[in-house]
């Protein structure tokens, strides 16, 4: 049996003596450790009284209902990152950037608890992060460090809190999967250089909204539903959890395409996912796993953000299917 590789060992080998990489390794280690604590809170479910309840009457900075556990997760991550070389934290739960370390060389964007609306139903939720380099001499306005196209990311990943606590991570050299070993307390490398199959017969979308979609997306789904007798010439399965980290992990495991389009409803014109906190980190992971990610037409990682809480339509997964969807536009 081959020797198990822990996250700590993997990061040490990857970083070596490079100070920039060491900073990234410290930040990812901190996020992973915070994630273990968040996973424990999620696992206790209704035993943790009030954590699944809506917090106040005002939505979070992204416009979504904020649960108590969203805030607790953000606090856990913020506390974990304080000793690391992270200058600022951008969070889906906070309107403004959160200053951490004035001498830091990183800025990190995080969705502390993606899918928190599913907590009551015991569905997998998770934490998504994006890491960008930061230089105070260059970025005199810290917001400008966050407001860069996703191609500038040096690392990204997500933790999925389900039957197992999973870390899917990239450092620009492929996409790796780590599993938290509850006996040793370590994250252990489970899959290296994940590759999403280019072809698929599986899509994930909330099909109940089809009546609100623009014609290109409606036409794509109609052709999938027509199956082997239709223009696609093959039968499709639909899978939709409604928690993006769970849907994403399925795609990294067995392929498929995830679709969250904009639609005609007020507030849904650009979908509901955030470019900086969700689309960019997942797009980086996807491309490093030989998949593709677009807003339906344009590569996600090339898009210039115009607001730290900007929403964007998102299509990611099996490359050929993402390109097929783009052809409908």
Swiss-Prot record:
GO terms for molecular function: fructose 1,6-bisphosphate 1-phosphatase activity; magnesium ion binding. Pfam families: FBPase, FBPase_C. Keywords: Carbohydrate metabolism, Cytoplasm, Hydrolase, Magnesium, Metal-binding. GO terms for cellular component: cytosol. Substrate binds at residues 114-117, 206. The keyword Transcription does not apply. Pathway: Carbohydrate biosynthesis; gluconeogenesis. It is found in: Cytoplasm. Its EC number is 3.1.3.11. Mg(2+) 1 binds at residues 92, 111, 113. It catalyses: beta-D-fructose 1,6-bisphosphate + H2O = beta-D-fructose 6-phosphate + phosphate. Mg(2+) 2 binds at residues 111, 114, 278. InterPro entries: FBPase_C_dom, FBPase_class-1, FBPase_N, FBPtase, Fructose_bisphosphatase_AS. GO terms for biological process: fructose 1,6-bisphosphate metabolic process; fructose 6-phosphate metabolic process; fructose metabolic process; gluconeogenesis; sucrose biosynthetic process. Homotetramer. Belongs to the FBPase class 1 family. NCBIfam families: PRK09293.1-3 (NF006779), PRK09293.1-4 (NF006780). This is Fructose-1,6-bisphosphatase class 1 2. It comes from Xanthobacter autotrophicus (strain ATCC BAA-1158 / Py2). The gene is fbp2.
């Amino acid at each position: 049996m081959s020797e198990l590789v822990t996250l700590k060992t993997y990061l040490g080998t990857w970083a070596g003596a490079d100070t920039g990489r060491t900073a990234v390794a410290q930040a990812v280690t901190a996020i992973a450790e915070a994630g273990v604590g968040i996973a424990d809170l999620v696992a206790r479910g209704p035993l943790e009284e009030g954590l699944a309840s809506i917090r106040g009457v005002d939505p979070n900075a992204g416009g979504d209902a904020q649960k108590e556990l969203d805030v607790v997760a953000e606090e856990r991550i913020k506390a974990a990152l304080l000793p690391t070389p992270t200058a600022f934290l951008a969070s889906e739960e906070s309107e403004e950037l959160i200053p951490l370390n004035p001498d830091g060389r990183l800025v990190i964007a995080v969705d502390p608890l993606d899918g928190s609306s599913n907590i009551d139903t015991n569905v997998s939720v998770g934490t998504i992060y994006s890491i960008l380099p930061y230089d105070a001499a260059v970025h005199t306005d810290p917001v400008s460090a966050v407001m860069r196209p996703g191609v500038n990311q040096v690392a990204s990943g997500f933790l999925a809190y389900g039957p197992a606590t999973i870390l899917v991570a990239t450092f620009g050299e492929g996409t790796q999967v780590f599993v938290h070993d509850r006996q040793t307390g370590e994250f252990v490398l489970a899959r290296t250089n994940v590759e999403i199959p280019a072809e698929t017969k599986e899509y994930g979308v909330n099909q109940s909204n089809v009546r609100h979609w623009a014609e290109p997306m409606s036409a794509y789904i109609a052709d999938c539903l027509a199956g082997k007798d239709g223009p696609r010439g093959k039968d499709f399965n639909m899978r939709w959890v409604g928690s993006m980290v769970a849907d994403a992990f399925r795609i990294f495991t067995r392929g498929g395409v995830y679709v969250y389009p904009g639609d005609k409803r007020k507030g849904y014109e650009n979908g509901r996912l955030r470019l900086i906190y969700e689309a960019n980190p997942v797009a980086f992971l996807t491309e490093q796993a030989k998949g593709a990610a677009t807003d339906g037409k344009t590569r996600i990682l090339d898009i210039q953000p115009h607001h730290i809480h900007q929403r964007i339509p998102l299509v990611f997964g099996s490359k050929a299917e993402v390109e097929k969807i783009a052809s409908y536009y």
